[in-house]
């Protein structure tokens, strides 16, 4: 089976890194086309032996990219076209249909209650999404929560399959030596209590709440933020105004899999933390929180479908808190008062094993190739 993955960009992001990890475990021939920004993940895919095509799209309305994508799909002889992220889902589904590929799968990575990839969920966004969705065979939701959102949007339930994001749990297993080495590299005192946050530095992630919480905590508490984005400048200003600039460390974008770039990879950064905090009020999955649980960290979160969809007891060490500085400050104080516990991975780490996700996705591919065009989908 030959599968073409179409994605909007290949910078360091959750969907992009999840794609790279999945491709390492899919027993089919995969190629990837990125509409824009090849980025670090493109280099990682190439290092893994995956052929990556760059379409060179200049913006959302660069319609000249569509015929180029159609030609690429036709030449490739693909059995399945699998699209990821809003723009790629729209262009990829259309291109696949024009190229004669009917087995089209799309993964919905980022649908929230009020936004998708930073876009407000207005009438136009919804209408365009549903128009494109009708050209596909299957829409994959990364969590039952996202599946419910898709149904409320109007996506027919028979066309929705849940394939959770997966992690390589062994990569995140805690290592005391790695913790000490990473703290030395980052200049973090061995005795400091380090609160960590991972994600795009964007307003919706609400990392400002963690900066506010830090100002309410003792001076030996540090905040380690892993990620990059448009909110970084505002967060630095907020830290200066709160008097905690010297206690906040911005680590930048870091890959889950070491890629040869300077600086520690995400598993090492998680090892350096004492508590993982996720103040985002709206998530589609919450992959970073699952990775933190795999690293044996206590997790405090505002929204995390990956945790909330689990059976009781599968995410020991994870607790929900309010999206407020005072709530996170209390959570840090409580966790610290309990003392250091053994850093053992939670059951959630095994529940979201990437090999299980890959096996479920292979089932989706097989069904998409085998079955006729579903009711409600367009046909030529």
Residue ranges and their predicted role:
Residues 5-64, 149, 229-230:
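N-terminal strand-loop element at the rim of the active site
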Residues 13-21, 193, 197-216, 230-236:
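A conserved mid-protein helix/loop that constitutes part of the nucleotide-sugar donor-binding site
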Residues 34, 298-302:
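Short hydrophobic beta-strand element within catalytic cores of glycosyltransferases
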Residues 63-67, 102-105, 112-135, 148:
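Nucleotide-sugar donor phosphate/pyrophosphate-binding loop at the beta->alpha transition
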Residues 73, 253-254, 261-264, 268-273:
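Short alpha-helical donor nucleotide-sugar binding micro-motif in glycosyltransferases
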Residues 145, 166:
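Carbohydrate-associated surface elements
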Residues 281:
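Aromatic "clamp/platform" in nucleotide-sugar-dependent glycosyltransferases that forms part
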């Amino acid at each position: 089976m030959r599968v073409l993955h179409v994605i909007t960009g290949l910078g360091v992001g959750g969907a992009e890194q999840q794609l790279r990890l999945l491709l390492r475990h899919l027993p089919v021939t995969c190629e990837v086309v990125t509409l824009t920004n090849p980025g670090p993940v493109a280099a990682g895919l190439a290092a893994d032996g995956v052929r990556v095509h760059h379409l060179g799209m200049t913006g959302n309305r660069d319609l000249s990219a569509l015929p180029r994508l159609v030609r690429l799909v036709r030449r490739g002889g693909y059995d399945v076209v699998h699209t990821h992220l809003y723009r790629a889902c729209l262009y990829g589904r259309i291109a696949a249909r024009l190229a004669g590929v009917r087995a089209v799968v799309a993964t919905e990575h980022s649908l929230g209650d009020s936004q998708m990839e930073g876009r407000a969920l207005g009438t136009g966004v919804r209408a365009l999404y549903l128009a494109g969705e009708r050209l596909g065979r299957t829409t994959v939701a990364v969590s039952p929560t996202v599946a419910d959102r898709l149904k409320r949007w109007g996506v027919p339930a028979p066309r929705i399959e849940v394939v959770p994001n997966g992690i390589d749990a062994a990569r995140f297993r805690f290592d005391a030596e790695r913790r000490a080495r990473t703290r030395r590299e980052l200049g973090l005192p061995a005795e400091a209590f380090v609160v960590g946050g991972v994600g795009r530095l964007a307003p919706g992630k609400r990392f400002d709440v963690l900066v506010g919480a830090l100002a309410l905590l003792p001076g030996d508490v540090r905040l380690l933020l892993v990620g990059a984005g448009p909110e970084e400048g505002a967060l630095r200003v907020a830290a200066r105004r709160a008097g905690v600039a010297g206690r906040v460390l911005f680590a930048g974008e870091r890959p889950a899999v070491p890629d040869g770039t300077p600086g520690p990879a995400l598993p090492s950064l998680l090892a350096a933390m004492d508590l993982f905090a996720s103040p985002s009020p709206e998530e589609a999955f919450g992959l970073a929180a699952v990775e933190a649980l795999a690293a044996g960290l206590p997790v405090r979160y505002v929204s995390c479908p990956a945790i909330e969809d689990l059976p009781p007891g599968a995410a020991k060490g994870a607790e929900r808190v309010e999206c407020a500085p005072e709530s996170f400050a209390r959570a840090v104080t409580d966790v610290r008062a309990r003392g250091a516990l053994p850093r053992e991975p939670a059951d959630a780490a095994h529940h979201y094993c990437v090999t299980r996700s890959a096996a479920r996705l292979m089932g989706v591919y097989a069904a998409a190739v085998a079955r006729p065009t579903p009711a409600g989908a367009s046909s030529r």
